[in-house]
């Protein structure tokens, strides 16, 4: 007969704070409710982002480069706010409350955007042929910004906790549930892609043919329904107690090491402080040895409690395990930095590539494809790549190499190569499009929009590899207690990629334009040299790839009993190159 403990999850509780009963809490039913709210979040955020540049240019009458930067700043802020959401979830609210609060904020943002696009007072008058267009007023732009950044705030809070709360529904100490958890992560990205697919097809079509206010209204109602369904699972969820922000631990280790910076390290690590010497979870490493000084025991490091027990002051003394956990986070940074450029190239797919599409012939018979819906090829590439990888590449790789698939670092490398190829394809197509534009006076150029498919497909396939590779890398190579933070760190690569795009657009616009020359990024892309901008990204991506390979070769996974769940092939070697 099984003990009562075998039917409960050791580190989880139910909604009343009791040990979580496996038969009554968690599992696929609750995970499905969580996946549902993520699908709606993707539907809303991507449905707005992929078609926003056309609204800003055609309705709000803003210049091309300004419109592109508004979109990338919006997306960048969305992912940057994941850090705020992760901090609140870890330190105060917990994942359940964080998801509930921030999903409500996102619903308010989409509702406000629906109103902003509906009321004539909140947008400039329509342009008539031959007349100068009146740009949006400061008040109209303020309303738009408030709506967008409410959505960004909601997205940031949601994304920081949604995958973690989903994994909380499975017990990683139960082999059966651990297998379900792995399947959950595999399907998590699939559901994200499905939400994006609905956004770039159904929602974008509604925006162009029915009205943006109706489309955004549907997003608002969908999120409201998803929130209600999510809350219906309150009694069935498994909850993990907040353990405090790992940011505090990082600062404690740094502060203790700085305090003892002039002290000499002992010859042997046995003289360094450890909470439980018999249960060291992470092997000591020689990298970043200056941080080891935080574990040197010195006078004044211990304080007496009221019971007379001596305990270490965490700002003066850290254990070897805590120091090694901080080292693990530091080791992630070079890989983190060299994946940012991918998301800069990704940003072009929802800004300038959509603008390119708006000038090209988009008809299939009598049906005219919305410019924003061209990103369907981007999403299709992701889904096809994931299917081919799961069904063909992984079995072949396992048979040939004896490994379950490409390592996380190998997948990231493949993603970087594909995105570079995608930008090269984009530059070549833009050269062709510009040559047609010079010889044509038509508003819609006599060139098929399907010439853009290769760039969407290559960057989309690249995302399938790099997103799953990054997620795997940042989760498996981070300390157990810092996985929410490491997920947030991963998502900041998306954020910074969008911000780098905005920065490059602004710099290129300023450097290449003069009083007599519109430069590379003209208000009308038919008069500029967008292809030069794409070639610039190809060069930057190539340089970044070389740096990435160096960083990947330098990276050494930390060995430990509990901190890192390693599989064959998680490392990176010269052979992997």
From Swiss-Prot:
Pfam families assigned to the protein according to its UniProt record, in alphabetical order: PTR2
Signal peptide: none
SUPFAM superfamilies: MFS general substrate transporter (SSF103473)
Disruption phenotype: Wider leaves resulting from increased cell expansion. Lower nitrate content of the petiole and midrib.
A molecular function GO annotation: symporter activity
The keyword Lipoprotein is annotated on this UniProt entry: no
TM regions (residue ranges): 28-48, 74-94, 96-116, 134-154, 183-203, 214-234, 332-352, 369-389, 409-429, 447-467, 488-508, 535-555
Induction context: Up-regulated in the shoots by nitrate, but no changes in the roots.
Domain of life, source organism: Eukaryota
One Gene Ontology term from the biological process aspect of the record: oligopeptide transport
Tissue occurrence: Expressed in shoots, leaves, flowers and siliques. Expressed in leaf petiole.
Keyword vocabulary terms for this entry: Membrane, Nitrate assimilation, Symport, Transmembrane, Transmembrane helix, Transport
InterPro entries in the record: MFS_trans_sf (IPR036259), POT_fam (IPR000109), PTR2_symporter_CS (IPR018456)
A GO cellular component annotation in the UniProt record: membrane
Membrane topology field: Multi-pass membrane protein
Subcellular location: Membrane
Family: Belongs to the major facilitator superfamily. Proton-dependent oligopeptide transporter (POT/PTR) (TC 2.A.17) family.
Function: Low-affinity proton-dependent nitrate transporter. Not involved in dipeptides transport.
Name of the protein described by the UniProt record: Protein NRT1/ PTR FAMILY 6.2
Native species: Arabidopsis thaliana
Gene behind this protein: NPF6.2
């Amino acid at each position: 007969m099984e003990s009562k403990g075998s039917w409960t999850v050791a580190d989880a509780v139910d909604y009343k704070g009791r040990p979580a009963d496996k038969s009554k809490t968690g599992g696929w039913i609750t995970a499905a409710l969580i996946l549902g709210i993520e699908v709606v979040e993707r539907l809303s955020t991507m449905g707005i982002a992929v078609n926003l540049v056309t609204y800003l240019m055609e309705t709000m009458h803003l210049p091309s480069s300004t419109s592109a930067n508004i979109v990338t700043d919006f997306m960048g802020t969305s992912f940057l706010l994941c850090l705020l959401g992760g901090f609140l979830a870890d330190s105060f609210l917990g994942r359940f409350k964080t998801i509930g609060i921030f999903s409500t904020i996102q619903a308010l943002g989409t509702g406000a955007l629906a109103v902003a696009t509906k009321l004539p007072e909140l947008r400039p008058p329509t342009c008539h042929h031959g007349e100068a267009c009146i740009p949006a007023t400061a008040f109209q732009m303020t309303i738009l910004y408030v709506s967008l950044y409410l959505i960004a705030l909601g997205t940031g809070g949601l994304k920081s906790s949604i995958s973690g709360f989903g994994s909380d529904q499975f017990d990683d100490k139960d082999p059966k549930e651990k297998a379900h958890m792995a399947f959950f992560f595999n399907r998590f990205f699939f559901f994200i892609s499905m939400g994006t697919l609905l956004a770039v097809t159904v929602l974008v079509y509604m925006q162009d043919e029915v009205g943006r206010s109706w489309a955004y209204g549907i997003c608002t109602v969908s999120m409201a329904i998803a929130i209600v369904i999510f809350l219906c699972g309150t009694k069935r969820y498994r909850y993990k107690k907040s353990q405090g922000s790992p940011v505090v631990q990082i600062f404690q280790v740094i502060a203790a090491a700085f305090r003892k910076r002039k002290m000499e390290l002992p010859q042997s690590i046995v003289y360094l402080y450890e909470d439980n010497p018999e249960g060291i979870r992470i092997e000591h490493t020689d990298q970043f040895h200056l941080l080891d000084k935080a574990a040197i025991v010195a006078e004044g490091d211990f304080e007496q409690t009221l019971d007379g027990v001596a305990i270490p002051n965490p700002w003066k003394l850290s254990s070897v395990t805590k120091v090694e956990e901080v080292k693990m986070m530091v080791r992630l940074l070079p890989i983190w930095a060299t994946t940012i450029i991918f998301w800069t190239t990704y940003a072009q797919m929802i800004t300038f590539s959509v603008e390119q599409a708006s000038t090209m012939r988009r008809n299939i018979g009598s049906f005219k494809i919305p410019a924003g819906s061209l990103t369907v090829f981007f999403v299709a590439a992701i889904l096809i790549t994931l299917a081919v990888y799961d069904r063909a590449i992984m079995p072949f790789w396992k048979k040939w190499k004896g490994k379950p698939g490409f390592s996380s670092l190998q997948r990231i490398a493949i993603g970087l190569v594909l995105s570079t190829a995608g930008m090269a394809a984009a530059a070549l197509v833009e050269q062709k499009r510009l040559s047609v534009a010079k010889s044509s006076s038509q508003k819609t150029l006599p060139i098929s929009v399907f010439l853009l498919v290769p760039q969407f497909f290559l960057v989309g396939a690249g995302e399938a590899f790099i997103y799953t590779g990054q997620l795997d890398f940042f989760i498996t190579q981070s300390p157990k207690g810092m996985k929410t933070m490491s997920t947030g760190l991963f998502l900041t690569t998306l954020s910074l990629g969008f911000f780098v795009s905005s920065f490059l657009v602004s710099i290129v616009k300023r450097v290449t334009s003069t009083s007599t020359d519109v430069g590379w990024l003209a208000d009308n892309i038919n008069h500029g040299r967008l292809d030069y901008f794409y070639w610039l990204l190809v060069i930057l991506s190539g340089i970044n790839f070389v740096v990435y390979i160096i960083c990947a070769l330098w990276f050494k996974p930390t060995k430990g009993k509990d901190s890192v769940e390693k599989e064959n092939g998680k490392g990176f070697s010269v052979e992997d190159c």
